[in-house]
Amino acid sequence: MRTPAMSTHLSLQHAQRCIAAAIAEAQRQRLAVCVAVVDAHANLLAFVRMDDSVPGAIDLAQRKARSAALFRLPSGELGRLAGPGQPLWSIEQSNGGLACFAGGMPLGDAGVSCLGGVGVSGASAAQDQSIAEAAVAMA
């Protein structure tokens, strides 16, 4: 008997589940956010802007998702590594399109493989992070 092969790419259906879970969590918290899902190469796969979310969150959600996918780390962790005196100091300046604060999570198998990333923006960094974690957990 063959074991099913693991998916090596992020499907639109998977991305839509992430978006739905993020929206549900944002609504539960009574927040309006933007949610972006990118593939392993950081290309946008799905995006939603909830009613009343701030316009600045559009770009930030995508940047957080991109950061998580490209570095296979939560964007907040990348931020800690990018601080003064840290190994990735000023990575945002040398590698454009990143956001090095909480709200982005890699999608995949717990560090084994990265299928993409989800990014949430529009609330506090901690709230964005909790919504992104809900998206990953339900995806």
Question: Residue locations for each model-derived region?
Answer:
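Flexible, solvent-exposed loop/hinge segments and secondary-structure transition points
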Residues: M1-A139
